[in-house]
Amino acid sequence: MQTVTLLAFLVFLFTYALISVRRVRSVSIERPAAALFGALLMVLLGVVTADQVVEAIDLDIIGLLLGMMIIVSCLEITGLFDRVASTMVDRCGDRFTLLWVSMGITALLSALILNDTVVLMFTPIIVKVCRSIDANPIPYLVGEALAANIGSVATGVGNPQNAYILIQSGIPFTEFAIALTPLAVMSLLVAVAIVALVFRKDLFDEGLRPHPIDRSLLAAASPKVRLEFPFFLVLGVLIAVFIGFLASSWLGMPVSLIAFLGGCFLLLALPLVKKDTGTGPILRGVDWTLILFFVGLFILLKGVETSGLMALMLGSFEDMGAGVAGVAGLTVVSSVLSNLISNVPAVMLLSPMIPVGDDTLWLSLATSSTLAGNATILGAAANVIVVEKGLSMGAEVRFLDFLKAGLPVTLVTLLMSVLLLGL
């Protein structure tokens, strides 16, 4: 092994260890800081040159994420999530209905916009609604986290790792959605059933009849929201962006450019029609830490590639192909890595090992890295957000509370994924 390859290997191991443990003694190390430090070491040790740093950063992925984040920030400012809560309230007459409606809405929104943002906005609403009807919020919070991850599987913009896979694989947005939406729908049904079974005492009486709830109490917890022109402007742009995604092949424009143009338009237009909103609040709604995390990983993995380390790693996967065996093998590796180092770095590490043009394995990587995150609280960022937000409002989701629903959901949905994509 050459010196540069050995250096790249040591930096790679050190950085991924930091990303995994997120702590050095008593000092907390956030994932973006760990990734950027690894990138810095690659440059300082001469593994990556200055020119290669610029070359490593994939502007397509950054543009897609940034554009969608700006649009979501504008939706939040104009009251989308309050309106969704009001709609949810109107449809619920018992606790089980509240569960499947809240999970369904969470999954749908997570397919359209980044799932982390959905749970960030939706968790306080769920806790507030549960408190108003004297219901245990734990089943609803666990269901929300599972639904957010499952719903995000359906499209290339539901979560960061899917956005990365969408760009790297070259799979058209429409084909991506058509291939994975059925799996997402079936997985959601499985999740609703398992959550209802695990938490049946909170949802049903002894005769297995759903506990009724007083809609007037729900209405008080989530009053009607008046929608004004700024909301419809943002919603119109979101719809236009998704139409652009569907027609991206015909338009000859990458989805990243479509999302970025939509975000830029709203960044300028929304402050003009909503006088109490400037560009500052919109930009504060962007997850800049995720952008920096991607930048650091891009440079780190460029070092892995240029040093020859990637070629050594790829040798172990030369015989991986489609079919049940190939999909199952990738699913196991991806699932384990996603729970050890989180799904985004796992996907970026495994993606060079996918044979060129093998859409089945790309889709398998998307499903396994996302669905595996449902196993434990730490398996996905959305889970952590739900748990931390709930805890801040006095609703504690314990590790076992999550595990007893999340683990069976993960095992069943991963098996469904292997069968659906492998056969």
Kindly give the residue locations of the regions a language model identified.
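Interfacial loop-to-helix junctions that mark the boundaries of transmembrane helices
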Residues: 1-6, 26-29, 51-61, 173-183, ...
